[in-house]
Amino acid sequence: MVFSSYKLPDLPYDYDALEPVISAEIMHLHHQKHHQGYINNLNEALKSLDVASATQDLTGLIAINPALRFNGGGHINHSLFWEMLAPQNKGGGTPPRHELLKLIEKFWGSFDNFLKNFISSSAAVQGSGWGWLAFCPKKQELMIQTTANQDPLEATTGMIPLLGVDVWEHAYYLQYKNARLDYLKNFPSIINWDYIESRFVEMSK
């Protein structure tokens, strides 16, 4: 089995488009260095997987799994993350409408209360990880989830990620230093709810 190589996706906006919430310096480093690094390591892991599979090296196959989970998760998470954001002059921060808003209000009482819970849960992640607004297809429910490191939400929990926030230090430290909460409080103003709502409509069918 030969796996195709993954490539870095283009951002749907310029590096400085999310300022002042996220600086151009952070966006460039995050996209070109960190995300590219996950892709490079993922492709190397897939090459090793090809060799181990061809030689039926079961020990080798098992040994590759952590690298696939970490780097594959990093690629999945960041590819979603870029799309979940939008400049403020292109709709970033505009609250959701329609069925998604109704469901948010059902589970959290109000949109503002959801944001408070999302921010507090994401701020509480110990070390590196992600905060998520997740959709459970089986129960047709929304819930707030967190994942460690680069664990991909759907592959590890079966939940569909609708909104994600990266709380690794590389996502904010150059600008916010150790004030993760300040980063998270500013984050809602660049959320692309149009994209998230379109994901919700597709995933809830």
Swiss-Prot record:
Record's catalysed reaction(s): 2 superoxide + 2 H(+) = H2O2 + O2
Pfam family, one: Sod_Fe_N
InterPro entries (UniProt xref): Fe/Mn_Superoxide_Dismutase, Mn/Fe_SOD, Mn/Fe_SOD_BS, Mn/Fe_SOD_C, Mn/Fe_SOD_N, Mn/Fe_SOD_N_sf, SOD_C_sf
Annotated EC: 1.15.1.1
UniProt cross-references to SUPFAM superfamilies, sorted A to Z: Fe,Mn superoxide dismutase (SOD), C-terminal domain (SSF54719), Fe,Mn superoxide dismutase (SOD), N-terminal domain (SSF46609)
Enzyme class: oxidoreductase
The keyword Metal-binding is annotated on this UniProt entry: yes
Keyword annotations: Manganese, Metal-binding, Oxidoreductase
Top-level division of the source organism's lineage: Bacteria
This protein's record includes keyword GTP-binding: no
Residues that hold Mn(2+) according to the record: H30, H78, D166, H170
Record note on cofactor: Binds 1 Mn(2+) ion per subunit.
GO molecular-function terms, A-Z: manganese ion binding; superoxide dismutase activity
Cofactor(s) needed for function: Mn(2+)
Functional note: Destroys superoxide anion radicals which are normally produced within the cells and which are toxic to biological systems.
Subunit structure: Homodimer.
Family label: Belongs to the iron/manganese superoxide dismutase family.
Protein name per UniProt: Superoxide dismutase [Mn]
Organism: Chlamydia muridarum (strain MoPn / Nigg)
Organism ancestry: Bacteria, Pseudomonadati, Chlamydiota, Chlamydiia, Chlamydiales
